[in-house]
Curated annotation (Swiss-Prot):
Glycans are attached at residue 24. GO terms for biological process: absorption of visible light; cellular response to light stimulus; G protein-coupled receptor signaling pathway; phototransduction; visual perception. This is Blue-sensitive opsin. It is found in: Membrane. It comes from Gallus gallus (Chicken). Disulfide bonds join 117-194. It holds the Pfam family 7tm_1.
Length: 361
């Protein structure tokens, strides 16, 4: 693989990070011709099929999350507002980002043009950032409710709404700059989906500073909030457990909480660590060659989160799962288990906290 082309000959709307045997790079524009010089047609078809799978799974799961919360009163707790917010952000990514990518991969180039690329890049980044910050808010809200660092503070609906609004404000702050000249939205990887420009340097777009901004503001800070909040939550629950008799119910609840926390943190890392690692590697290894197809993997991981985040935060919750089954099967669960978090798990304080707060319900 040849090193990337010099940054002195940059088109305004795209950049292909590899040397290409073409006298006029514009003739290979990802907005004009199939990008089969970057990968085989089979690879593009496979990516289109994967994006279609994300759409087919993500739309029903996230739509059901919203509909079930509206339909069942017991799901409309203040701590669940952020899950509806997460579902809305996921739907934005799916309906704009994944759908556009699916069509583009099927055509093997970004057939919708530069303006659509900017719209798709902005919308997908906005939805992704809102989703990312929603995971941090989920963790922090549970820290406030369970650990009670503010004493007798009561978590109200207004606080939940404020948390949701904050995610959209922070998401806009992170995703809007490329629309105004701080970095830019261009086709990435196989040139069939759009995102911030990680590839170029020493130019008018100042991409290096934008990448560092995203790394700090949209990965480091949320990750610190998540690790701190869930770490304190585990410490608090262990302290509660030590004050009680170590019954089988308490031990089971403790294991469930620990497992849920680990899954939540890993879900965040699986979603965003590849994107962050790739962007930082490109910024700090200018001139180093890399497989262009691999540059599509981080985007795939982030778009996949629209499916596995609802699985972690919604389907792993008994109350949400029970309500979804009732909705789908006309009011009765096919398994005959009217799961309710107010059952035997409330035999001890720690088990009650684990089921109704850590796994949001």
């Amino acid at each position: 693989m040849h090193p990337p082309r010099p940054t002195t000959d940059l088109p305004e709307d795209f950049y292909i990070p590899m040397a290409l045997d073409a006298p006029n790079i514009t003739a290979l524009s990802p907005f004009l011709v199939p990008q089969t010089h970057l990968g085989s047609p089979g690879l593009f078809r496979a990516m289109a099929a994967f994006m279609f799978l994300l759409i087919a799974l993500g739309v029903p799961i996230n739509t059901l999350t919203i509909f079930c919360t509206a339909r069942f009163r017991k799901l409309r707790s203040h701590l669940n507002y952020i899950l509806v917010n997460l579902a809305l952000a996921n739907l934005l990514v799916i309906l704009v980002g994944s759908t556009t990518a699916c069509y583009s991969f099927s055509q093997m180039y970004f057939a919708l043009g530069p303006t659509a690329c900017k719209i798709e890049g902005f919308a997908a980044t906005l939805g992704g950032m809102v989703s990312l910050w929603s995971l941090a808010v989920v963790a922090f809200e549970r820290f406030l409710v369970i650990c009670k660092p503010l004493g007798n503070f009561t978590f109200r609906g207004s606080h939940a709404v404020l948390g949701c609004v904050a995610t959209w404000v922070l998401g806009f702050v992170a995703s809007a700059p490329p629309l105004f000249g701080w970095s830019r939205y261009i086709p990435e990887g196989l040139q069939c989906s759009c995102g911030p420009d990680w590839y170029t340097t020493d130019n008018k777009w100042h991409n290096e500073s934008y990448v560092l901004f995203l790394f700090t503001f949209c990965f480091g800070v949320p990750l610190a909030i998540i690790v701190f909040s869930y770490g304190r939550l585990l410490i608090t629950l262990r302290a509660v457990a030590r004050q009680q008799e170590q019954s089988a119910t308490t031990q089971k609840a403790d294991r469930e909480v620990t497992k849920m926390v680990v899954v939540m943190v890993l879900g965040f890392l699986v979603c965003w660590a590849p994107y962050t690692a790739f962007a930082l590697w490109v910024v700090t290894h200018r001139g180093r060659s890399f497989e262009v197809g691999l540059a599509s993997i981080p985007s795939v991981f982030s778009k996949s989160s629209t499916v596995y985040n609802p699985v972690i935060y919604v389907l792993m919750n008994k109350q949400f799962r029970s309500c979804m089954l009732k909705l789908l099967f006309c009011g009765r669960s096919p398994f005959g288990d009217d799961e309710d978090v107010s059952g035997s798990s409330q035999a001890t304080q720690v088990s009650s906290v684990s089921s109704s707060h850590v796994a949001p319900a």
